[in-house]
């Protein structure tokens, strides 16, 4: 059976849409009529996906990490209960409240019922199920332990979401503070300063240097503020476009890695992802070289990716994993020692997991320390700027009071 998306009218003339399974479009139309619906459009999901791909869509946005973790966890639980895979996919699709996810799962189930493996069926949605996900599912299907593999994938997605949530929560306060500070300074320069200082200019009073500087800044902001904002947005767009060029992105990422604080954070994030992903791959009986290739895909820094791919080539030529990674000079000594211990004891999976946990904790600690320093410094800078504006605005008034008191 195939999956079809339909648009129909009910007895009251209201539009309805959804996903239904059937052998062909005619059968689906008949089933809709039996439900007192007038079919307006019935399209097989695979045909619709092909149309969408030609137009540049078809799940290119993917789905959120929490949604992926949820459907993976639900599927793992149902597979563990002994239900046939087709019924598990149907149940998860019916439980989903989001039409996009429901449509995707029904289409995946349709391919599974046609005889395709689950990993092949998921391959139609590469922006939702990445290579790590599909490779592990394929390994689970071959080994007969699909349920445990899905559980590990759900844990992996949930851990990534937790780390992302912690980082986002830590960044909320500084970002709000920056926006608030910029807003206050812009308001003072654009609205308050011209009205107060302008009175002294009209009186012909000589202004202190700080006040004159403030007035010039206010005039510049009023005349060129919008152009400056547009230019800034264009610059951001240009930088993002340039970073899509592989050679420029590689040089940029190499520079990022060499920075004092940001570089340490970037190394910690990428090495932790590598260790955790490789741990999951080895636990799913994926060969070490294939696991390294999959782990590289989840890393975000192109320079780190390049170095790890070179390390994978060294492993292929017979080097140990520890020595190959040590040559990159990107992995912390503790992680390298734990990997060496895992190779010698045959417990590489467990040691990689512990190394990833340690690196995650170190990453979180580094971020907290950096934000702990940055936030007070930002508050002090904001207070200094506001104080400068207030004092520069009040200085002509104080000078006038001194002249009048003499």
From Swiss-Prot:
Q: How does it sit in the membrane?
A: Multi-pass membrane protein
Localization per record: Cell inner membrane
Q: Which GO terms describe its molecular function?
A: metal ion binding
Q: Keywords in UniProt for this one?
A: Calcium, Cell inner membrane, Cell membrane, Membrane, Metal-binding, Protein transport, Transmembrane, Transmembrane helix, Transport
**Which positions in this protein are listed as binding Ca(2+)?**
97, 151, 155
A GO CC term? type II protein secretion system complex
What processes in GO biological process is this protein linked to?
Answer: protein secretion by the type II secretion system
Q: Which residues cross the membrane?
A: 172-192, 224-244, 369-389
Tell me yes or no: is NAD among this UniProt entry's keywords: no
Q: Which domain of life is it from?
A: Bacteria
Asked if the Swiss-Prot or TrEMBL record annotates the protein with the keyword Ribonucleoprotein, the reply is no
Residue intervals annotated with topology Periplasmic: 193-223, 390-406
PROSITE patterns from the UniProt entry: T2SP_F
Cite the ranges annotated as topological domain Cytoplasmic: 1-171, 245-368
Protein task: Component of the type II secretion system inner membrane complex required for the energy-dependent secretion of extracellular factors such as proteases and toxins from the periplasm.
Similarity comment: Belongs to the GSP F family.
Q: How does it assemble?
A: Type II secretion system is composed of four main components: the outer membrane complex, the inner membrane complex, the cytoplasmic secretion ATPase and the periplasm-spanning pseudopilus. Homodimer. Interacts with EpsE/GspE and EpsL/GspL components.
This chain's protein is named: Type II secretion system protein F
Native species of this protein? Answer: Vibrio cholerae serotype O1 (strain ATCC 39315 / El Tor Inaba N16961)
């Amino acid at each position: 059976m195939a999956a079809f998306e339909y648009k129909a009218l009910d007895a009251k003339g209201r539009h309805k849409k959804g996903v239904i399974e059937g052998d062909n479009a005619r059968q689906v139309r008949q089933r809709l009529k039996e439900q007192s619906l007038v079919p307006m459009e019935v399209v097989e999901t695979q045909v619709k996906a092909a149309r969408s791909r030609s137009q540049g869509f078809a799940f290119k946005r993917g789905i959120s990490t929490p949604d992926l973790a949820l459907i993976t966890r639900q599927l793992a639980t149902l597979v563990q209960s002994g239900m046939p895979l087709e019924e598990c996919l149907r149940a998860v699709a019916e439980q989903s409240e989001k039409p996009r996810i429901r449509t995707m799962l029904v289409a995946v189930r349709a391919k599974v019922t046609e005889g395709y493996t689950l990993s092949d069926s998921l391959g139609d949605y590469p922006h939702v199920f990445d290579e790590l996900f599909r490779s592990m599912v394929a390994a689970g299907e071959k080994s007969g332990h699909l349920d445990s593999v899905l559980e590990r994938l759900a844990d992996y997605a949930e851990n990534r979401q937790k780390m992302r949530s912690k980082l986002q929560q830590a960044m909320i306060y500084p970002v709000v503070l920056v926006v608030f500070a910029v807003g206050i300074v812009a308001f003072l320069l654009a609205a308050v300063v011209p009205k107060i200082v302008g009175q002294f200019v009209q009186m012909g009073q000589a202004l202190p240097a700080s006040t004159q500087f403030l007035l010039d800044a206010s005039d510049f902001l009023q005349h060129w503020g919008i152009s400056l904002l547009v230019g800034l947005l264009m610059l951001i767009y240009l930088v993002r476009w340039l970073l899509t060029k592989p050679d420029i992105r590689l040089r940029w990422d190499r520079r990022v890695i060499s920075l004092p604080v940001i570089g340490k954070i970037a190394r910690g994030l990428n090495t932790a992802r590598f260790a955790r992903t490789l741990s999951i791959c080895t636990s799913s009986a994926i060969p070490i070289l294939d696991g390294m290739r999959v782990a590289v895909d989840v890393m975000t820094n192109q320079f780190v990716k390049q170095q790890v791919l070179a390390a994978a080539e060294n492993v292929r030529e017979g080097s140990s994993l520890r020595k190959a990674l040590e040559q990159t000079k990107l992995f912390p000594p503790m992680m390298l020692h734990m990997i060496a211990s895992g190779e010698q004891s045959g417990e590489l999976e467990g040691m990689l997991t512990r190394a990833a946990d340690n690196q995650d904790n170190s990453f979180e600690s580094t971020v907290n320390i950096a934000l702990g320093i940055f936030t007070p410094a930002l508050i002090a800078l904001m207070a200094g700027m506001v104080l400068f504006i207030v004092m520069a605005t009040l200085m002509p008034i104080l000078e006038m009071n001194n002249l009048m008191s003499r």
